[in-house]
Amino acid sequence: MINIRKTHPLMKIINNSFIDLPAPSNISSWWNFGSLLGICLVIQILTGLFLAMHYTSDTTTAFSSVTHICRDVNYGWLIRYLHANGASMFFICLFLHVGRGLYYGSYMFLETWNIGVLLLFAVMATAFMGYVLPWGQMSFWGATVITNLLSAIPYIGSDLVQWIWGGFSVDKATLTRFFAFHFILPFIIAALAGVHLLFLHETGSNNPTGISSDADKIPFHPYYTIKDILGALLLILILTTLVLFSPDLLGDPDNYTPANPLNTPPHIKPEWYFLFAYAILRSIPNKLGGVLALVLSILVLAFIPLLHTSKQRSMMFRPISQCLFWILVADLLTLTWIGGQPVEHPFIIIGQLASILYFLLILVLMPITSLLENNLLKW
C-alpha cells in the first residue's frame, strides 16, 4: 500500500517538516522554543480574533469595548488576559530563542537568522500597536511618545509623523489604522515563520556542539514531537497560572484609566519586554542619536554573523566567551530594570553605562575574545 503521508503533495510537506525530518540526536531543551513560538502565535491569533469580534476601534468607544469584553462577554476576561499575557510569553520565548541562537552560533545560517531578525521587528511592531488599542492612558501616551520619535528623522520627520497619525495628534485615525495593522501583521508573521522554517530545513538544525550532525540523525517524530509536547504543556501551565492568579502582574495600572490627551502620566513607559530598548533610547540625550541607538539595539543582531571571529561555532567549549555572554544577559536585565525607573540620579548613569556595555560587548569584546581563544587553543 502506498503511504499517503509520503506521496500526497500537501501531506508530503508536513511529513518532511514534522515527521520524517532528520534531526540531530543531541539537541537540548533550548531547541524547544521554535515550536513554543509557533504555539504562542496560534494562541495570539485565535484570542485576538475573538477579541476583534467585540472590539471597536473608535476613540470614544475603544476603552468601553474592552471593559465590555471583560464584564459582559462569556469568558471575555479570560480571552483578554490570555491575549495580553500571551504576548508576554511570546516575548519570553523570543528572547530565549534568540539567546540560544547567540550562544550556540545558530546565526551562521544566514538566511534563517536574518528572517528571524525581521520576525523580531515584526513582532515588536505588532505588540506596540496592540498596546495602543485598549486606549488607556499608557496606550495613548506610549503611542504619542514612540511615534513622535520619527520626527527626529532629518527633513521628512515631521511630515512622516503626521502621515502616520493621520492628523496633527494621535487620534481616531491613528487608532483605526493601528487596529488594521495589528490584525494583519500576525498573518504576515505566520508567513515569515514559514519562510524561516523553509530556510532552516535547507541546512538542518544546529546542535549544542556546533559541529555537523549529519553522521548522527534521528527522525523528528516521535522523539522531538513528544519533547515539544512537554515544552508546550509547561508553556500552557505558566500562561494559565499567570492569567488565572495574577493577570495584571505585567501590566501597567495607568492603562485602566481612559486616555486623556490633557493629562500626562507621571512615568510614561512601555510594556516590560520593550524596557531594555527604551532604556537605551533614554540613555542618549540627543533625540536622533537615541532613535538610532534604539533601532541598532535590535538591528545589531543582523551584524553578529559578520562579527563571528572564532574557529568554533558554538560557545559550548569557550569559557571566556560564555562569561561575556552571561554578562550580556545580566546587562539586558539591568537595562530592563532601568527602563522602568524614573529619569533621575542614579538611574540615568546606570542606564548610560549599561547601554555602552551592551554595544561594547557585542561589537568589540566578544569578537576580540573569540580571537584570543583561537590563539589560546593554538588554532
From Swiss-Prot:
Gene3D superfamilies per the UniProt record, alphabetical: Cytochrome Bc1 Complex, Chain C
Membrane-protein topology: Multi-pass membrane protein
Membrane keyword on record: yes
Binding site for heme b b566: H97, H196
Protein's UniProt name: Cytochrome b
Alphabetical list of CDD domains matching this protein: cytochrome_b_C, Cytochrome_b_N
Localization, UniProt: Mitochondrion inner membrane
UniProt keyword annotations, A-Z: Electron transport, Heme, Iron, Membrane, Metal-binding, Mitochondrion, Mitochondrion inner membrane, Respiratory chain, Transmembrane, Transmembrane helix, Transport, Ubiquinone
Biological process (GO), any one: mitochondrial electron transport, ubiquinol to cytochrome c
Cofactor detail note: Binds 2 heme b groups non-covalently.
Residue numbers binding a ubiquinone: H201
Organism expressing this protein natively: Nectogale elegans
Transmembrane segments: 33-53, 77-98, 113-133, 178-198, 226-246, 288-308, 320-340, 347-367
InterPro entries: Cyt_b/b6_C, Cyt_b/b6_C_sf, Cyt_b/b6_N, Cytb/b6-like_sf, Cytochrome_b, Cytochrome_b_C_euk/bac, Cytochrome_b_N_euk/bac, Di-haem_cyt_TM
A single GO molecular function term of this UniProt record: ubiquinol-cytochrome-c reductase activity
Main location (coarse class): mitochondrion
Source species taxonomy: Eukaryota, Metazoa, Chordata, Craniata, Vertebrata
Protein purpose: Component of the ubiquinol-cytochrome c reductase complex (complex III or cytochrome b-c1 complex) that is part of the mitochondrial respiratory chain. The b-c1 complex mediates electron transfer from ubiquinol to cytochrome c. Contributes to the generation of a proton gradient across the mitochondrial membrane that is then used for ATP synthesis.
Additional free-text comment from the UniProt record: Heme 1 (or BL or b562) is low-potential and absorbs at about 562 nm, and heme 2 (or BH or b566) is high-potential and absorbs at about 566 nm.
Cofactor: heme b
GO cellular-component term (any): respiratory chain complex III
Binding, heme b b562: H83, H182
Subunit-structure text: The cytochrome bc1 complex contains 11 subunits: 3 respiratory subunits (MT-CYB, CYC1 and UQCRFS1), 2 core proteins (UQCRC1 and UQCRC2) and 6 low-molecular weight proteins (UQCRH/QCR6, UQCRB/QCR7, UQCRQ/QCR8, UQCR10/QCR9, UQCR11/QCR10 and a cleavage product of UQCRFS1). This cytochrome bc1 complex then forms a dimer.
Taxonomic superkingdom: Eukaryota
Family per record: Belongs to the cytochrome b family.
